Amino acid sequence: MKTTTDFLKMKAAGEKIVMVTAYDYPAAKFAEAANVDMILVGDSLGMVVLGYDSTMPVTVADMIHHAKATRRGAKDTFVVVDMPFGSYHGDVNETLKTAIYMMQETGADALKVEGAGDIIPVIQKLTTAGIPVVAHLGLLPQSAGVLGGYKVQGKTAEQATKLIEDAKQCEEAGACAVVLECIPHQLTEIVSAHLIIPTIGIGAGVEADGQVLVYHDMLSYGSHHVPKFVQQFANMGKEASEGMVRYVEAVKAGTFPAQKHFFTMKEDALDQLYGGVQS
């Protein structure tokens, strides 16, 4: 399994870091078999798995449930788990208790939090306690309402300057990596150059030190809206939909189950069942 030190070395060597989300055992198995470098159990599961309109309803219990399944499917991959909305915005000592609980319950290798500013003390508190933290800047899904929706961030010089400073503060606070979401690719290049820790982009251009995509988006699996920055590398949704239709048709037509799917009793057992007389 790779470690935070390995990711620093990969950045220094110019080797791209591959991260993908996973929320359950089979997805994690696929990801590990493909040799991804990191798996993110994101609170995006609220939208792509649980059917919510945003990530805000996702709870700590939700994250632990899905992270446990993911960890079982990817025992040898670096797993990052999101701290959900509201779990790290209050007293830092309470946040630390929650973070420790999540780490112990899930077997995660790191936790991820969104934002800078008031979140910097959280990053410091967790990393001082020995919990690796991945920061998240740019578009912050948990704060999308405050940001005016799911829009590109850092497009003005003022916004870009603030994001660069926020990234530096996250690194100084002890973050082991930073996710950059939906920012101009030129800004990604600048931020990446200013940091020792790796940047992981999502909708942030090729200049990031690594990339992350949502499993369901990249495989077209149940996603009704695909963002501009996503490339679909397979069409699982189409295959699943067509397979479901074929199943319904086969059952209705009486062609499933076929004889090869049957289990059979021996004749003497049948005789005993019917008392030697079969109708």
Swiss-Prot record:
Listed pathway(s): Cofactor biosynthesis; (R)-pantothenate biosynthesis; (R)-pantoate from 3-methyl-2-oxobutanoate: step 1/2
The EC number(s) this enzyme carries: 2.1.2.11
Catalytic residues identified in the record: 181 (proton acceptor)
Subcellular location, principal: cytoplasm
Positions of Mg(2+) binding: 43, 82, 114
Subunit details: Homodecamer; pentamer of dimers.
Entry function: Catalyzes the reversible reaction in which hydroxymethyl group from 5,10-methylenetetrahydrofolate is transferred onto alpha-ketoisovalerate to form ketopantoate.
Record's protein name: 3-methyl-2-oxobutanoate hydroxymethyltransferase
Organism: Lysinibacillus sphaericus (strain C3-41)
Protein's gene: panB
